Every structure is written in C-alpha cells, then in structure tokens.
Design a protein with these regions (language model features):
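Short amphipathic alpha-helical segments at helix-loop
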Residues: 1, 54-57
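Intrinsic-disorder/low-complexity signature in envelope-associated proteins
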Residues: 1-18, 22-23
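Soluble non-cytosolic domains of exported or imported proteins
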Residues: 3-7, 60-67
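Conserved "boundary/linchpin" sites in short secondary-structure elements
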Residues: 11-18, 34-55, 70-104
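Short loop/turn motifs at secondary-structure junctions and domain boundaries
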Residues: 24-28
Length: 104
C-alpha cells in the first residue's frame, strides 16, 4: 500500500477503535497487527505480532489494548481497500499507536 492508502485504512479502523481508559502513558502503547484480507476488504485473519508481550507481568494493559485493536478491525469490516493491486495489500502489517490517536 502507498502511505496515503495505509493512512486511509488506519483512519477507518481508528474510527472504530474504542481505546481503553487508564492506559499508562509512560509505557509503549504500540500494537502491531498482521492482517490477511480478501479482495473485498473482509478480514480472513488478524494476528497480534507482539503476542508474547500480552502475558508478561505488568503488561495487562497491553493485552486489553491489543484486544481492543483487534475488535476495531472486526467492527470496521469490510475495510475500504484499493480496487486494484490485491497482491500488494492482501497481507498487511499495521501499527496502532494509542498515544498517536489520543494526542490527535
């Protein structure tokens, strides 16, 4: 995806994302998600790339944050994807930074 296409996709998902309250701002609030998409923008698979972090001590907030990002992807289906170039965007990695969204 081009940068503008990726930004548009993230903006769509951000619109569906209810970020949990009470996040520790001094922590890394980045969630990396790998997506596999159908040509119509439906999600075949979504996977948290930092899955091991979800079960580390003191990272309970990350599990809640990551699960909320996955829910946003499910709620926003089908994603608005380009009508051409399926091979370029059928497998994507998107970075969701809660701090970026909260700070505007």
């Amino acid at each position: 995806l081009s940068l503008s296409e990726e930004d548009a996709l993230k903006a769509q998902i951000f619109g569906c994302w209810s970020i949990p309250l009470g996040l520790p701002y001094n922590e890394n609030l980045l969630v990396r998600i790998k997506l596999k998409l159908k040509p119509d923008g439906s999600v075949i698979k979504s996977e948290i790339l930092d899955h091991a972090r979800m079960n580390k001590p003191g990272q309970g907030f990350y599990k809640v944050l990551a699960e909320s990002a996955l829910r946003a992807i499910q709620l926003c289906q089908p994603l608005r994807v380009p009508t051409t170039g399926y091979d370029r965007w059928k497998d994507l990695q998107l970075n969701f930074d809660a701090r970026e969204m909260l700070e505007g």
